[in-house]
Each structure stands twice: as structure tokens, then as C-alpha cells.
């Protein structure tokens, strides 16, 4: 493996090929799981440069709304959300490629999930390109199951182990910190992996890590869906799901870096906001019943912890 951080001449083509394949693979698997509804594809172009391929599934047997979006956009200047902590990026033109997905299930016992893998490069004449990878995946249950959390985090560990024993704890902690709703003082879910600004060792090494995380997502999510999708539920569980979806919407509209980047860079609004739940309910000063399964989400699952099963 090369130890140079030089960007290969065909880096964009390599990454784009992988991302399109990843989008296809995930969509085929989700359609197979759902068994009723197929993805609607919407290809789009961005006037300032680039475009994408948005795929949306709605009102399925298993998935109430699922979006799997590929985008490849470029521009003359990075928006503030991407350059605020990297002053050396000022005045550089950029390219950004990624696959981002959010899945909102019908059954409240099936968790919502989000995953994203992406690549940025910022270039300037007579200067070396500045590039990095980012992404991760995280899980947002409404009703917690220890075995699901353990499986999710074990799969996250498996994605990271080929790249060293320090990667998983670092990316896990980063995920816990990132997906925290500060104004509510609570986590969005039970975490997973999150990383950004990653360009360690070489392009090949960094690209392989991004691919590993992308490829492990469906391995983490599919078994959980299979275990929970047929559990009976009623109005109480659906109401709690819609209430908790409000937290999801709050995070995405207030804090999410990808949402801010997309809106600030003149991205396609429909694709950027595909992450929002189809139905949401806010209730003033609501609190779960003492000892209820709803309360256990707050006490036993949302606080950050080590979910790896002890041997």
C-alpha cells in the first residue's frame, strides 16, 4: 500500500463507481425486505455544477419512508458549514460525492436508521488538493432491545477492525458526541460510527475504510429489521414513534452538518430534506410513564455506553 497522501488522477471516478454500486445494492435489499413497494428514482442536475440520483420509497409494508440518495456536486467555494473549522479551504473550488440514506419504518419496534459515506476534495491552482472522507451509520430505536444494540455495535466494530483497534472507539465516541441534541440534553439514538476529515496513511487506505463502513451498514441493519418488523403494535406505540420522530427532525434541521452543507451550497432541497420523517408529533412537556417501555428508552438506551457484548 502506498503511504503517499497524493490523490490519484482517477480518484473521483473510483469513488463515484463505488457509491453508485452501493446505492444500487442497498436499494435492491430494501425492496426485497419490504416486498411491496419499489424505489422511485429522480435524477437531477445542479445549475452550479453536478447532480445526483435520489431514490425514495414510501408507504411500503415495512418502510413508511426510505430515501437513498447519491450526489456529486461541485462549486467555486465551499460553504461555511464545510470550511468553518478549516481556514486553509477558503478560496478553493470543491467537489463532494456521497451516498446518504435515512429509513423510517412503519413498525415502531423497528428502529429508524441513517447512514452516509462521502468524499470531499478542495482544489486551488498551484496547490496540492485537500481531500478527506467522512461518514458513518447510526441507529435510532423507539423501543430498545439489548441484543439489537449489541449486534449493531459489533457490526460497527467489525467494519473498523481491519484498520486498527483504535478506530471503532474513536468513531463510536465521535458518533455519540455528534448525534446529541443539545437543547434537549439527550442523544438522538444509540449511536454507531461517525467520522469526518479522514485522510490517514494514504488515499487507498482511507478509501478502503470508507468502503468497509458503507458495506457493513446493511449487515448491521437487516437482521434487526427481520427480528422486529412483525411485532404487533397499536396506537400507543405509533404515537410514541411520532413523538420521538420530532427529535429526529429537530436534530436534522438544527445541527446536522450534511443538511447545512446541502442548503448552504445550493443543493437540491427535496433531496436534502428527504431525511425528515413522513409524520411527526410534538406534545408540550410530555413525559413517559414511570416504569414503561417508553421510559426505558430514556433511562437504559439513549445514555451513551459500551454496547459490545462481553465474552
UniProtKB/Swiss-Prot annotation:
Q: Which gene encodes it?
A: hemF
Q: Name one GO cellular component term.
A: cytoplasm
Q: Where is this region: Important for dimerization?
A: 248-283
Residues binding a divalent metal cation are 104, 114, 153, 183
**Metabolic or biological pathway:** Porphyrin-containing compound metabolism; protoporphyrin-IX biosynthesis; protoporphyrinogen-IX from coproporphyrinogen-III (O2 route): step 1/1
Instruction: Give its E.C. classification number.
Output: 1.3.3.3
The site feature described as Important for dimerization is recorded at: 183
What does the record give as the active site? 114 (proton donor)
The entry's protein name is: Oxygen-dependent coproporphyrinogen-III oxidase
Where in or outside the cell is it found? Cytoplasm
Cytoplasm is among the record's keywords: yes
* Gene3D superfamilies per record: Coproporphyrinogen III oxidase, aerobic
User: For this UniProt entry, which residues form the secretion signal?
Assistant: none
Name the SUPFAM superfamilies for this protein: Coproporphyrinogen III oxidase
Primary subcellular site in the record, as a coarse category: cytoplasm
Q: How does it assemble?
A: Homodimer.
Top-level EC class: oxidoreductase
> What InterPro entries has UniProt attached to this entry?
Coprogen_oxidase_aer, Coprogen_oxidase_aer_sf, Coprogen_oxidase_CS
The free-text function statement in the UniProt record for this protein reads: Involved in the heme biosynthesis. Catalyzes the aerobic oxidative decarboxylation of propionate groups of rings A and B of coproporphyrinogen-III to yield the vinyl groups in protoporphyrinogen-IX.
Which UniProt keywords are listed?
Cytoplasm, Heme biosynthesis, Metal-binding, Oxidoreductase, Porphyrin biosynthesis
Amino acid at each position: 500500500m502506498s503511504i503517499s497522501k497524493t490523490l490519484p488522477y482517477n480518484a473521483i471516478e473510483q469513488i463515484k463507481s463505488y457509491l453508485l454500486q452501493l446505492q444500487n445494492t442497498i436499494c435492491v435489499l430494501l425492496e426485497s425486505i419490504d416486498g411491496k413497494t419499489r424505489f422511485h428514482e429522480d435524477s437531477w442536475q445542479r445549475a452550479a455544477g453536478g447532480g445526483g440520483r435520489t431514490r425514495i420509497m414510501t408507504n411500503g409494508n415495512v418502510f413508511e419512508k426510505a430515501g437513498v440518495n447519491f450526489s456529486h456536486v461541485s462549486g467555486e467555494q465551499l460553504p461555511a458549514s464545510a470550511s468553518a473549522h478549516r481556514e486553509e479551504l477558503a478560496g478553493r473550488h470543491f467537489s463532494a460525492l456521497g451516498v446518504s440514506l435515512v429509513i423510517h419504518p412503519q413498525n415502531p419496534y423497528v428502529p429508524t436508521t441513517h447512514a452516509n459515506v462521502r468524499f470531499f476534495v478542495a482544489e486551488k491552482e498551484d496547490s496540492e488538493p485537500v481531500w478527506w472522507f467522512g461518514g458513518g451509520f447510526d441507529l435510532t430505536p423507539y423501543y430498545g432491545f439489548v441484543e439489537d444494540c449489541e449486534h449493531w455495535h459489533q457490526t460497527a466494530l467489525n467494519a473498523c477492525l481491519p484498520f486498527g483497534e483504535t478506530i471503532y472507539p474513536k468513531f463510536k465516541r465521535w458518533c455519540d458526541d455528534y448525534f446529541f441534541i443539545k437543547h434537549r440534553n439527550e442523544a438522538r439514538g444509540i449511536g454507531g460510527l461517525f467520522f469526518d476529515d479522514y485522510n490517514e496513511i494514504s488515499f487507498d487506505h482511507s478509501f478502503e475504510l470508507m468502503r468497509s463502513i458503507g458495506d457493513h451498514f446493511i449487515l448491521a441493519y437487516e437482521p434487526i429489521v427481520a427480528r422486529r418488523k412483525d411485532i404487533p403494535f397499536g396506537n400507543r406505540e405509533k404515537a410514541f414513534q411520532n413523538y420521538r420522530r420530532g427529535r429526529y427532525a429537530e436534530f436534522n434541521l438544527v445541527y446536522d452538518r450534511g443538511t447545512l452543507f446541502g442548503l448552504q451550497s445550493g443543493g437540491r432541497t427535496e433531496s436534502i430534506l428527504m431525511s425528515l420523517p413522513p409524520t411527526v408529533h410534538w406534545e408540550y412537556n410530555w413525559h413517559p410513564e414511570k416504569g414503561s417501555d417508553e421510559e426505558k428508552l430514556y433511562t437504559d438506551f439513549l445514555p451513551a455506553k459500551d454496547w459490545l457484548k462481553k465474552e
